[in-house]
Amino acid sequence: MNSPTTATAATSAPVTAVDPKSFTRFAEFYPYYLGEHRNPACRRLHFVGSTLALVCLGMLVATGRPYWLLVGLLCGYGFAWLGHFGFEKNKPASFKRPLYSFMGDWVMYKDIWTGKIPF
């Protein structure tokens, strides 16, 4: 009789639960962050949300109207959370490590632009 571990190992790699709070350095956290963004649709939604957030930041600077900050945050987080809940089927790491997740989003954004991570 197969144990749950054996059955899981036979069909796919076992999933190990990692608490994002356990990381003490961003360099340790980033590989975990990328693992939470395996689905291309999730990455694309992050990319679109980050791009729109940058546009909103530009509008904030150009117009001086503070509501662009709110719109930028809604775009950035809204698209990312849609990717996680709709496609990746996981909870965003920003719920447990908000600063590292924010940093990870911008590093991933750069990595997509430079071709290090597929769009």
Regions found by a protein language model. Give the residues of each.
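Core segments of transmembrane alpha-helices
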Residues: 45-58
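Structural signal for membrane-spanning alpha-helices in multi-pass inner-membrane proteins
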Residues: 57-60, 83, 112
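Membrane-proximal soluble regions of multi-pass membrane proteins
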Residues: 13-33, 89-119
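Transmembrane helix interruption/hinge and helix-loop junction motifs
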Residues: 60-68
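Short, non-transmembrane cytosolic segments of multipass membrane proteins
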Residues: 1-18
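Short, amphipathic, aromatic/basic-enriched membrane-interface segments that mark the entry/exit
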Residues: 35-46
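Transmembrane alpha-helical segments that form the membrane-embedded catalytic/substrate-channel core
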Residues: 75-88
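Hydrophobic alpha-helical transmembrane segments
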Residues: 69-74
